[in-house]
């Protein structure tokens, strides 16, 4: 039984870590509330294939599990288009030193 029925999740990236997040979160949230941003075709979750498609959904929580070099692009897009979202970014945060700061959303690195 899903506990958080009205919350929506975006998982950016569906490699091994993205899959783990999707499997764990699908035990808490309804699968229909989980969207995966990936180029892969996935039958068990809703997918979007381009970052700009993210505008169509309004996620409460965002997990960034893409390759490290792509984290900055995702964070900048989210920061530009959303407020008050909770973001989990897989470590390391960036592949090279960066002074970008998330100000409109809450960002955690793990």
What is each residue range found by the language model?
Residues 30-32, 82-86, 105-106:
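A short helix->loop->beta-strand "cap" motif at the edges of active sites that frequently abuts
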Residues 59, 64-71, 92-94:
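N-terminal glycine-rich "phosphate-gripper" loop used for MgATP/nucleotide binding
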Residues 48-58, 101:
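Short amphipathic alpha-helix with an adjacent loop that forms part of the alpha/beta core around
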Residues 8, 60-61, 86:
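Structural motif
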Residues 1-45, 57:
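N-terminal Rossmann-like dinucleotide-binding module
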Residues 93-110:
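A contiguous active-site-proximal alpha/beta segment in oxidoreductase catalytic domains
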Residues 69-90:
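Rossmann-fold NAD(P) dinucleotide-binding segment
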């Amino acid at each position: 039984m899903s506990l958080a029925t009205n919350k929506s999740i975006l998982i950016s990236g569906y490699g091994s870590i993205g899959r783990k997040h999707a499997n764990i979160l699908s035990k808490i949230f309804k699968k229909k509330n989980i969207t995966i941003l990936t180029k892969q075709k996935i039958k068990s979750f809703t997918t979007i294939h381009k970052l700009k498609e993210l505008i169509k959904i309004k996620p409460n929580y965002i997990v960034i599990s893409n390759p490290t070099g792509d984290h900055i692009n995702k964070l900048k897009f989210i920061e530009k288009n959303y407020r008050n979202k909770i973001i989990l970014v897989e470590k390391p945060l960036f592949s090279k030193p960066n002074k970008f700061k998330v100000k409109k959303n809450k960002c955690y690195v793990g």
